[in-house]
Amino acid sequence: MNRLPLRARVLSECFRSKSLDPVAVVEHSLAQIESHKHLNAFVRVSSEKALEQAKQSKDRHDANSPKSILDGVTIAVKDNFCTKGIHTTCASRMLQNFIPTYDATVVERLQAHGAVIVGKTNLDQFGMGSGCIDSIFGPTRNNWSEDTNDDRFRIAGGSSGGSAVAVAAGLCYAALGSDTGGSTRNPASYCGIVGLKPTYGLVSRHGLIPLVNSMDVPGIMTRTVDDCASMLNAVAGPDVYDSTTVKRPFESIAPLEKQMSLKGVRIGIPIEYHCDGLEKEVLETWTVIADMLESAGATVKAVSLPNTASSIFVYSILNQCEVASNMSRYDGIEYGHRSQEDSSTEQLYARTRAEGFNGVVKNRILSGNYFLLRENYDKYFQKALKVRRLIADDFVRAFKEVDVLLTPTTLSEAPLYKDFVQSNNRDQCAVQDFCTQPANMAGIPAISIPIRLSSRQLPISLQLMGDHFTERNLLQVANWIEKQVDFVANYS
């Protein structure tokens, strides 16, 4: 077979029946990664470690004692999560030679469940982008592209584009992404897979190299909602190494209902998401699914999130302020890239950062430092914090009326690379993250699910958002939609 067509749950059953074994699956995955190198999804492949983990998994299955449903399942990890003994670069020259001495908590937990880590995936440098094009390893190509040569390919979305393509192209079963303003859901939408941003604090950020501490969340990328639930079960829960995780234990999500009743489920349609730039086919898809939900017994009603128009500006200000703070640790002295020009401490510091960061990162640092100047602090940063609270309050009011919000994930299908690069990074993110970043501002869970193909044969996806810690309900509704549209069976 050229792809990995099975769900993790079905794969686990195959392992149990001995019709497949983990070593064969990992060997197939490694072969697929090699044959799809032109997509540039992976920046590093951990073949030896993966085969070693696969052999251990096979031994457990042979003894009928697998660790979990994920035992032997191939997983990719975005290259901003620390992996012990494996380079973690954030796709930046600044960390090009960084080899962590520990695993991120989410990586550690997946391996504790028997998952096999096959490699690290591409991203925009330090996660700053929405196209997966600003990387020292070059851009990632969307596997749905009509043409993957030169600059005629479709972008994968970002910043977790490598993880999205790895799953969509069948190179692995699932992948870790990170989500600060849509970096898991945006590429999931463009690549036709499922992308979950959990509630802030539900999944540990320990070992995730920070971009925006108050919004960063580890994301989950899979081909089906059921696999997404299995991944969440493995990684969610409190962590002593991350003080922002909630202290209560995570209640595992049981296998999702195949025939869920929508009676009594209240679906909200935010009127502000019907915005400029929303493509006709995306709007039509949104309408069709809303009608489908209503026909199945759900109550569908319009709701208002009045501060949505301000959200992208507030997100941009807060993002750049936290970036300026987080990037200040890279000075060429403690770790990371070190310039050869070290005639003085100031010269070393300046040259290290000039050489180590790309233009996008430097621009965000510059903007963030400007907003944080004493004369600008109240005018920009403090005001942005106040509006962020208003945005969060919009969601609080909305979830008193409805259980789930249904919106587009992105305003369009995946753009062509040659068109995408005509805009600067800030303008790109303002368009690509319009529908996704409000969930990060409010800290609520959101999931992108593929619905159908456009007239250009490219994926169109929709997003569901729920109140804090309602992942179970969110996944149930997403699973119901997935069963109706059957994207995997129809288009994969």
From Swiss-Prot:
GO terms for molecular function: ATP binding; glutaminyl-tRNA synthase (glutamine-hydrolyzing) activity. It is found in: Mitochondrion. It comes from the Eukaryota. GO terms for cellular component: glutamyl-tRNA(Gln) amidotransferase complex; mitochondrion. It catalyses: L-glutamyl-tRNA(Gln) + L-glutamine + ATP + H2O = L-glutaminyl-tRNA(Gln) + L-glutamate + ADP + phosphate + H(+). InterPro entries: Amidase (IPR000120), Amidase_dom (IPR023631), AS_sf (IPR036928), GatA (IPR004412). The active site is at K78, S159, S183. Keywords: ATP-binding, Ligase, Mitochondrion, Nucleotide-binding, Protein biosynthesis. Belongs to the amidase family. GatA subfamily. Allows the formation of correctly charged Gln-tRNA(Gln) through the transamidation of misacylated Glu-tRNA(Gln) in the mitochondria. The reaction takes place in the presence of glutamine and ATP through an activated gamma-phospho-Glu-tRNA(Gln). This is Glutamyl-tRNA(Gln) amidotransferase subunit A, mitochondrial. The gene is gatA.
